[in-house]
């Protein structure tokens, strides 16, 4: 697959040799990050079958240019799909195109299917009724708000309206509320010959299918059986291989039928861009962004450099949060990178192995069906990214991460000399055994002091224990562990000997890790939202809100009342960006930088 940029839109071209191609249309908002691995998997599955594919980000989404909360975007997205069709034709010579979309992407694909090259549609759990879709979004937002710590919940506002970080303008919501895909398709001037629909519930797309059938379209419907295991936060999401392979098979069958009908099939170029071109540049008002491939594993990232920045200077490595692609949940990492560029600071947002657009973790290229969010390979890849940037001449490499991304940032700083500073937001633990499953980790989080403390005063909680519905042993173990940590925090000298003797990468004790950061000279800022469960370990080992870290010279903690766990609230992201800007500009460069230019085609030498 090859990264390309067209009209400010970032995309990936997957090679094929036929005259029939596919354009994949992304879902929107939080579902874009949740659905990314499925879209990549489908593109690769089609490419293996010899079908050229273009998957891309609409303007104002993903890595493309544009601000993501401006006005109503529906018509703009339809134009973007038309531009993608034309670019696929130019690159590969295809004469027919299938549009395939997931969720709102399926809706947009249908609305764009009047394009003369489009002969078929594959719709995966399409949004057929806009009002129902908005109700789903509202329910999801309400669930998120209800699960916030009380302090953070109290400061939430309804405007700007956002769902898991994606802002929806009033104009956009108004447009969505009036969306009836069946009605829209009944008035569309031209329709494709064939349509495949994978429904998340039986009959969910009946109104649309009836309209298409009445207008003579060949419609095939199937159940999206693995939808609900798939469409959830990336840490838990399971790749829906069954449905994706069925969709690819249906598309391939249509391609074969078309070739059989055409006595003289159009010839298409067999290959499309075997490597990155130097025109794959994303230009925004504040930055120049380039796709880069680096390291022995061929990791992928976007290097974002300020337009007016001087050579060298500080640079931020923005890590993956859970299994989310380098763009971040609801485009958070893109917004942060471009905001920091406006402040004169460069950044690299990249994907570790097994995540986003980087290679799989497995040597045989097999994709993980479920993300491994605390994998040692992720820590190694963060270290590789930092070392690569240091070689490029940046004087201070700062690694930034949220939750599991904070963990990989912190752990990488223990093993990579190139890392000069770390900004860890809502770090849950200083050490997570790699063998610990996500389910086991979540079970342990049920017994944090933030949850157990208030529960002690609630009789109904004790009734769960007395009735056997909640185990007493894990609760007692949690209290004992917390008490032991607090006792140890009164004797800071106990762990110093371990730091000298142990390999920094294998350290497990929070005190030893902090002492190692001190010895290595890594400036560290630990940022927490008020009430975040990560405070449990910080408070136990370093006093309330980490006050005992004042004994150190390089490690500090800050607790903010308006910061939610994932920085979905736009004000929380703004707060953390401002703190990061101040922190980075206070760093002292080690030496004058000597810049190594980015290699031709955007592909950087392997380390």
Regions found by a protein language model. Give the residues of each.
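Glycine-rich "HGGG/HGxG" loop immediately N-terminal to the catalytic nucleophile
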Residues: 57-72, 350-370
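N-terminal cap/lid segment of alpha/beta-hydrolase-fold proteins
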Residues: 1-20, 253-314, 569
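Alpha/beta-hydrolase active-site loop
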Residues: 38, 69-91, 365-391
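Alpha/beta-hydrolase fold nucleophile elbow
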Residues: 91-103, 390-403
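Gly/Ala-rich beta-loop-alpha elbow adjacent to hydrolase catalytic centers
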Residues: 100-109, 125, 400-409
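The alpha/beta-hydrolase serine catalytic core
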Residues: 72, 117-248, 373, 418-577, ...
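Short, surface-exposed "cap/lid" segments of acyl-processing enzymes
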Residues: 16-57, 306-352, 361
